[in-house]
Amino acid sequence: MQIIIDGHKVPINPRVSKDLLITLKSIARSLHWGILYDTNRETVYINTKSASVPVPPHERPASSPAEAESNRLAGKTICIDPGHGGSDLGAIGPTGTIEKDNTLAIALLLCDKLEKNGATVIMTRETDRDVSMPDAETEVELGARVDIANGADADIFISIHNDSFTNPTAAGTTTFHYGHPESIRLANCIQKSLVEGLGTRDRGVRFASFFVIRYTKMPAVLVEVAFISNPEEEVVLASIDGRYKAAESIFQGIVKYFKV
């Protein structure tokens, strides 16, 4: 296993073990460092300058000139809401992976992809922080996210989350809407694309009364990408490859929704 701190490789190659990963994550978080384990390359990335999850630039897949120059989403304003953040950790996986880190990493990758295709992207948060204020009441925090989307007059709103359940075998992808026909159509586009892209179980498109999709004034969905409580899906959510696939899949769902 490699350990890379602030872009520099540490001259040791310890054997991968669950205990070592948990220890590294515990140390990093106690010092407010960002940490990410790439399962495919057996590499731990640590960012000592920020608590944000590191996304190594050299790991980013090169976009083709056509993708980089595309304007097919020009004129579209898309609000992306990385679930949780700051004092709100969200759910925690079996090995200590934190939901707020996963959602932010996926959202940032999605933002980059959307902007390369001409969209104007509004992020409710771009770092590991509370959107309103630390330890605010839930409705105040969620209301701040809704206000950002409504204030930007966004065309669509997408809130990104990880699912969790007490039974670790629970698995799959679900996309929620609040019943508006266009929200249902957006949910179907994203759900189909995510299931195909990640190869997860299709848990379907469902109605829910979540605050952020109930009070937004545009087509809105809340996406549960996969179960962080499921050991296998936790690995996908925490990996660079899994996060890219999730971001790319949501992007393709958005493209299908706008029919561009």
Regions found by a protein language model. Give the residues of each.
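Active-site-adjacent mobile loop/cap segments within catalytic or ligand-binding domains
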Residues: 159, 166, 204-260
